[in-house]
């Protein structure tokens, strides 16, 4: 919660920088990604990316907001040409088309909610999500591994999250409705084969 992040920022030594990763901030309603906290703390910086809702992962474009001394220090250590002209042009075009971003968010949220409900109807556990991915939980690590292997055999790549201490889970990016419908069908096939 924002309150927990504020408490964390208050407890940090002044020389320790708290970096807030706002990669998914645009998916939330009334969430500023930490901007208000950055405005009031000298050791907090917030980063954002064009990789998620803007769909520009390959362009490697992002931005940060923080106290002037922190930004000045970052300016001194960054590479001289860290962004290409095409990447900047694409990012500028993307950020000016907020109507498109609004539609993307609405489509993502509707598809994500349908996807979660469909997976739960299959008897699977899913965490609630406010982003562009779903955390699908299985009974155990073995079942998650078997599902991952089955999905790969069908040309579907998802992300194992063992490294986040979630060996029984798979992280699945929300695609368009047709893709998610296909994926629900493939997961249902897997479950039937497990019986």
Region locations from a protein language model:
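PLP-dependent enzyme catalytic core of the Aspartate aminotransferase-like
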Residues: 3, 153-154, 159, 163-195
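PLP-dependent aminotransferase class I/II
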Residues: 43-127
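Short acidic/glycine-enriched loop/turn segments that link adjacent beta-strands
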Residues: 58, 130, 165-168
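Short beta-strand-to-loop capping motifs
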Residues: 66, 136-140, 174-176
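Conserved PLP-binding catalytic core of the aspartate aminotransferase-like
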Residues: 109, 121-154, 170
């Amino acid at each position: 919660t924002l309150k927990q992040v504020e408490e964390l920022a208050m407890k940090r030594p002044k020389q320790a920088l708290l970096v807030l990763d706002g990669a998914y901030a645009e998916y939330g309603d009334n969430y500023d990604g930490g901007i208000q906290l950055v405005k009031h703390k000298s050791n907090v910086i917030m980063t954002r990316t064009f990789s998620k809702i803007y769909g520009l992962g390959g362009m490697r474009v992002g931005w940060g907001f923080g106290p002037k001394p922190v930004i000045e220090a970052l300016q001194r250590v960054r590479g001289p040409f860290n962004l290409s002209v095409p990447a900047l042009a694409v990012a500028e075009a993307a950020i000016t088309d907020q109507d498109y971003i609004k539609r993307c968010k609405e489509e993502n949220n509707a598809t994500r909610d349908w996807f979660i409900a469909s997976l739960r109807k299959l008897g699977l556990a899913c965490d609630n999500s406010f982003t562009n991915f779903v955390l699908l939980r299985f009974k155990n690590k073995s079942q998650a591994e078997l599902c991952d292997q089955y999905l790969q055999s069908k040309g579907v790549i998802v992300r194992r999250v063992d490294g986040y201490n979630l060996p029984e889970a798979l992280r699945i990016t929300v695609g368009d409705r047709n893709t998610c419908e296909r994926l629900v069908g493939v997961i249902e096939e897997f479950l039937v084969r497990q019986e």
